[in-house]
């Protein structure tokens, strides 16, 4: 009887899988971390719940109610999970049959849609965006057969722009009765007028992903939300873990979503937008920067001369950016998280010193 290695025992799709390269996984030794779109400083919270001997609620009532009120939806339309990343995976697990169904997404965009599908053994189809990074609706229409979930990130990571709302409507009409459309609104707090939350009544197949990692400054909490109609939420509840949120996470999330927590978040957003405009203006004057793209988020995408050399030079100086060269249509591009004024100045000074 022949023996097999542990790796041989693993599923073939897992053996072939390239894991998502998160900012932390990519490493680096820096003082200026501008590669993960985090808020630059920590927000303090005190735990109020000490019942750590008991299992938590699956869907903590106060968290759900606070988020529903904030988002302008009913509590029955909210699911809380371990980051929006878990929401991405739950939607695939609930709606896609491995080896039969597919998801569709439009690169350049967030990398977890493909990783989540590939892990489960669900086909990934891609329709690259147009030159202006808007949706190729004809291309999507041509590839929809067999697709159960379509992911659209708006504002899009890493490009920073909003998807045209009329294109969203067209996509929702194309997919009606065929597939779930997922609007990933991880960065919507920086442009709240563009949220699709008000469209849920009109489109039963729309789902929206949200997070506390960006504007709420709680990336370390791992707390995200899916907004959808009750029928979708009930299906997701069948596949979510029994205790997705620990008691301390639920405690802090509820505080962050209190009226005063929302006010504080909006103050942070205003500060980041001011800093973003300062950094954009400065980048446009730097010789090694070829192009700075408009942003509706807390990060800036820019195209550089000799971007790999620039990236490494700043890395060696302890300034960690995110290289986007491998993404479709993003040759020469680096993504810069908007940090503090001091961090912005470090980036500006380092880039001005580049001889390329």
Curated annotation (Swiss-Prot):
HAMAP family in the record: HisC_aminotrans_2
Gene source species: Escherichia coli O6:H1 (strain CFT073 / ATCC 700928 / UPEC)
GO MF annotation terms: histidinol-phosphate transaminase activity; pyridoxal phosphate binding
UniProt pathway: Amino-acid biosynthesis; L-histidine biosynthesis; L-histidine from 5-phospho-alpha-D-ribose 1-diphosphate: step 7/9
Keyword Transferase set for record: yes
Protein name per the record: Histidinol-phosphate aminotransferase
Cofactors, names only: pyridoxal 5'-phosphate
Group of enzyme by EC: transferase
EC number assigned by the record: 2.6.1.9
Similarity comment: Belongs to the class-II pyridoxal-phosphate-dependent aminotransferase family. Histidinol-phosphate aminotransferase subfamily.
């Amino acid at each position: 009887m022949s023996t097999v290695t542990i790796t041989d025992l693993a599923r073939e799709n897992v053996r072939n899988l390239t894991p998502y390269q998160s900012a932390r996984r990519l490493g680096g030794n820096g003082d200026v971390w501008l590669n993960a779109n985090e808020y630059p400083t920590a927000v303090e919270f005190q735990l109020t719940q000490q019942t750590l001997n008991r299992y938590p609620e699956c869907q903590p009532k106060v968290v759900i109610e606070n988020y529903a009120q904030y988002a302008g939806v009913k509590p029955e339309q909210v699911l809380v999970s371990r980051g929006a990343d878990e929401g991405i995976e739950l939607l695939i697990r609930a709606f896609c049959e491995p080896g039969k169904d597919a998801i569709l997404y439009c690169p350049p965009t967030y990398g977890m849609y493909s990783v989540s599908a590939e892990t489960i053994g669900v086909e990934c189809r891609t329709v690259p965006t147009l030159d202006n990074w808007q949706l190729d609706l004809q291309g999507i229409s041509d590839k929809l057969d067999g697709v159960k979930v379509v992911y659209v990130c708006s504002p899009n990571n890493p490009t920073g722009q909003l998807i045209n709302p009329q294109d969203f409507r067209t996509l929702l009409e194309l997919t009606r009765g065929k597939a779930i459309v997922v609007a990933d609104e991880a960065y919507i707090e920086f442009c709240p007028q563009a949220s699709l939350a008000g469209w849920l009544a009109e489109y039963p197949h729309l789902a929206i992903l949200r997070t506390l990692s960006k504007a709420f400054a709680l990336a370390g909490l791992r707390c995200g939300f899916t907004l959808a109609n009750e029928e979708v939420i009930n299906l997701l509840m069948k596949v979510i873990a029994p205790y997705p949120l620990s008691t301390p996470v639920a405690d802090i999330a509820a505080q962050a979503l209190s009226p005063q927590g929302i006010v504080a978040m909006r103050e942070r957003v205003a500060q980041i937008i001011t800093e973003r405009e300062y950094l954009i203006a400065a980048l446009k004057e730097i010789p090694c920067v070829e192009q700075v793209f408009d942003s509706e988020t807390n990060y800036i995408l820019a195209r550089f001369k000799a971007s790999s050399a620039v990236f490494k030079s700043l890395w060696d100086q302890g300034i960690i950016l995110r290289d986007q060269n491998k993404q479709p249509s993003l040759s020469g591009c680096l993504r810069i998280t908007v940090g503090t004024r001091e961090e912005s100045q470090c980036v500006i000074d380092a880039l001005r010193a580049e001889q390329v």
